[in-house]
Amino acid sequence: MKKKIATMMFVLGLCVSTVLGGCGKKDADSSAESANTESGDSADDSQGDGSTFSNLNTFSCETMDGGMFTQDDFANKDLTVMNFWMTTCAPCVQEMPKLEEIRGTLPDNVQMVLVCLDADTEEEAAKEIIGRTGYTGLVTKSGDGDMEKVNSQILYVPTTLLFDAEGNRVGSTIVGSSPDLEGVYTEAINTALSEMDKEEWKK
């Protein structure tokens, strides 16, 4: 009996932690938060997120300020950190002020880009969230080409992927948010830079 109760408490604990971590993409589409990923989990391509992710060698995205972001914009940096989010995902919105802090301390060879997956239909909501949370970095809409493939492969938001100067996937996948977002991002960025024989991010 004690063993059964302990098992139930463990499962309940996992459920509570996942509610804080992120939203299922389907549930976010219907404006419902759900328990889908353990808070702060990092995963390889085939772990934790249920899918693999394509490279971004050929794509284009409209930015929220009316510009364009393409694969050519990767070439200016050694590493691009892309955070995929939705307007209906509370953890996505809650982490944006911290993402702004992290973005402001990144080294010159690393850039951060936020991709709003539902901005095509929720542009005004996306702009309101960006303004309210104080995020001043680049935010794009969902895009086409290889970006469309990646968007379809994302099961949970927020999901963060890292790409090299040629648009190839590097490092690990960050699925969900985390109370120690800065620590999670620092580890992921330094792992990717190390894989590419680049100097690690010194904080």
What feature does the model see in each segment?
Residues T58-T80, G104:
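A short beta-strand-turn-helix
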Residues K26-S60, E187, K203:
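N-terminal, intrinsically disordered, polar/charged segments of Gram-positive cell-envelope systems
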Residues T18-G22:
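C-terminal motif of bacterial Sec signal peptides marking the signal peptidase cleavage site
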Residues M1-M9:
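Bacterial N-terminal signal peptides that target proteins for export
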Residues V93-R132, D144-K149:
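Structural microenvironment flanking redox-active thiols in thiol-disulfide oxidoreductases
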Residues E128-A165, I174:
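Short, internal strand/loop/helix patches
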